[in-house]
Amino acid sequence: MAKAKDVRITISLECTGCSQGNKKYPGVFRYTTQKNRRNTPTRIELKKFCPYCYRRTICREIKK
């Protein structure tokens, strides 16, 4: 049986370099992934590659 509240949720990670405006192309790049609420209750910050900025930047979890 499934539990009432799912442990894994889908989150979006947004590039911080794109949101500050120092990039070559217009737009903001976002990754979609899942996280476990019990293991990581706080917001996630990962270093991922951004094709708009052409480098690895910090991507932060955003609200949906």
UniProtKB/Swiss-Prot annotation:
<dbReference type="InterPro" id="IPR011332">
    <property type="entry name" value="Ribosomal_zn-bd"/>
</dbReference>
<dbReference type="GO" id="GO:0003735">
    <property type="term" value="F:structural constituent of ribosome"/>
</dbReference>
<dbReference type="GO" id="GO:0006412">
    <property type="term" value="P:translation"/>
</dbReference>
<dbReference type="InterPro" id="IPR001705">
    <property type="entry name" value="Ribosomal_bL33"/>
</dbReference>
<dbReference type="InterPro" id="IPR038584">
    <property type="entry name" value="Ribosomal_bL33_sf"/>
</dbReference>
<dbReference type="GO" id="GO:1990904">
    <property type="term" value="C:ribonucleoprotein complex"/>
</dbReference>
<comment type="similarity">
    <text>Belongs to the bacterial ribosomal protein bL33 family.</text>
</comment>
<dbReference type="GO" id="GO:0009507">
    <property type="term" value="C:chloroplast"/>
</dbReference>
<keyword id="KW-0689">Ribosomal protein</keyword>
<dbReference type="InterPro" id="IPR018264">
    <property type="entry name" value="Ribosomal_bL33_CS"/>
</dbReference>
<keyword id="KW-0934">Plastid</keyword>
<protein>
    <recommendedName>
        <fullName>Large ribosomal subunit protein bL33c</fullName>
    </recommendedName>
</protein>
<dbReference type="Pfam" id="PF00471">
    <property type="entry name" value="Ribosomal_L33"/>
</dbReference>
<keyword id="KW-0687">Ribonucleoprotein</keyword>
<dbReference type="GO" id="GO:0005840">
    <property type="term" value="C:ribosome"/>
</dbReference>
<keyword id="KW-0150">Chloroplast</keyword>
